[in-house]
């Protein structure tokens, strides 16, 4: 076999292996909170819950510490007769309309930019409300 044919066969085999690997690797899925907003996460205070819709409606995202919403999605939830699924699976970053603070003492803040930067809105302990127009569907992180 000539060098050209060997090289062509090697390249073709390598391409087949690369294509096979590319199709065998599953796509990474977005992370989601458990959807259970609580006032005590293992002694760490409570969750700051973001909702897809105004007035604490629709799917929600909960986490006490998120300095960047990228990669997180809203999750459908139910609790007794309440619940929401509108927006489930949608990215949290730049898609929240309202917030509920389940912390027992701290004010939770939602920020326009990642890493607690830019315009922010605070929610005192055990309060809720709609995000202001500059943050509604323009949210990137949270902090205390």
Regions found by a protein language model. Give the residues of each.
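Compact beta-sheet-dominated domain cores in extracellular/mature segments
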Residues: 2-22, 26-144
């Amino acid at each position: 076999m000539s060098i050209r044919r060997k090289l062509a066969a090697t390249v073709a085999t390598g391409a087949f292996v690369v294509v096979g690997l590319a199709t065998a690797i599953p796509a990474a899925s977005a992370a989601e909170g458990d959807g259970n907003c609580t006032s005590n996460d293992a002694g760490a205070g409570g969750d700051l819950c973001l909702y897809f819709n105004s007035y604490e409606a629709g799917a929600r995202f909960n986490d006490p510490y998120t300095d960047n919403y990228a990669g997180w999605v809203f999750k459908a939830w139910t609790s007794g007769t309440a619940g929401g699924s509108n927006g489930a699976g949608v990215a949290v970053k730049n898609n929240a309309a309202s917030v509920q603070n389940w912390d027992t003492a701290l004010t939770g803040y939602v920020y326009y930019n990642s890493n607690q930067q830019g315009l922010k809105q605070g929610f005192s302990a055990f309060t809720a409300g709609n995000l202001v127009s500059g943050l509604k569907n323009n949210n990137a992180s949270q902090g205390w």
